[in-house]
Amino acid sequence: LNTILNPDENIKTYFKDADKLFDSSSIAHSDRWTIELPMELEIIKYLEYTLSKIILQIEREKPLTNNECYFYRLSLAHEYMHLEAFIMTARNLGFSIFNCHKKILNTDFFKSKKVIIKEKKLNKRNLNLEFLFDNETIQLNLNTKPYEIDTSPVSVESFIRFYENNGYSNKLLWSKEGWNWLLRNKNNTFINLCTYDKNRKFILNKWFGLDHLVDSNFPALHISFFEAQAYCNWKKRRLPTELEWMLATKKKEFEWGYVWEWTNDTFMSYKEFRPHPYEDYSKPWFNDHQVVKGTSFATQKKFKSIRFRNFYQKHRNDVFVGFRTVKDLL
């Protein structure tokens, strides 16, 4: 934020070596667990100090236009992302935070159906948005053909059926990369997370530290791209493209927003791409990640948008991510 303030108005750095502690652009993921961070109380003081200074700056500047509000909105969007990352971390470490997982556990899910999509055109509304990320300026290919798509993400019951039909032992269903991933991660798949008893009661094991009974229509989550792809091959279907997913949201039957959803699209650069001031947000991850759409139960409500382009590497199953399937009609 200091980059948009006058030199004599810059917010003073609270920690002398803050970048060495918190700069995600320069700290490798593998090193983040070993950094000697300040004590919790000191972190809280740091947050309160920074927030108070930013609020004063907003009151002084009184930003009104989209350009004037850009860095404030970027900071808020980034905070929304990290709030969800905190919840993901809590799940991994086995404790509850904000009780936000109760929302999805208490939701009644319905059996998924199929809906046919014939629309080809998507309104180009991105230029009118108050805020957008640099990767959201892409103009998607509009040459879609009619297709059939699930109205809901694949359920735990459907995915367990895939497992029962030798889905995890049939090498022909998996890509070469996916099969190698499976061999290395046999104890870290959806089948290790979700089990069932003789009465076919489905259980999420040690989810936020506790075992939870879930309905058969509960969305399968913590699914890697490789598992989703193998399931689609088993069903003789495929994952939707990003555009197909977005077009389907126009249908009232289309349910989304409880789990992120894998798409068939690689997160790529494009001819008109220009990085925004937060240069490391998109550019370093092109060609190495998969586009993920929607939101999860842990996402802040104000962050929900069909335009948002999330992205993860294919092996990631620590995320609250599931998928749905598509069938070509022509």
Language-model-detected regions and their locations in the chain:
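Acidic/His metal-coordination segments adjacent to aromatic residues that form catalytic metal sites
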Residues: 27-40, 64, 213
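Core domains of carbohydrate- and sulfate-ester-processing enzymes
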Residues: 13-29, 118, 173-210, 283-295
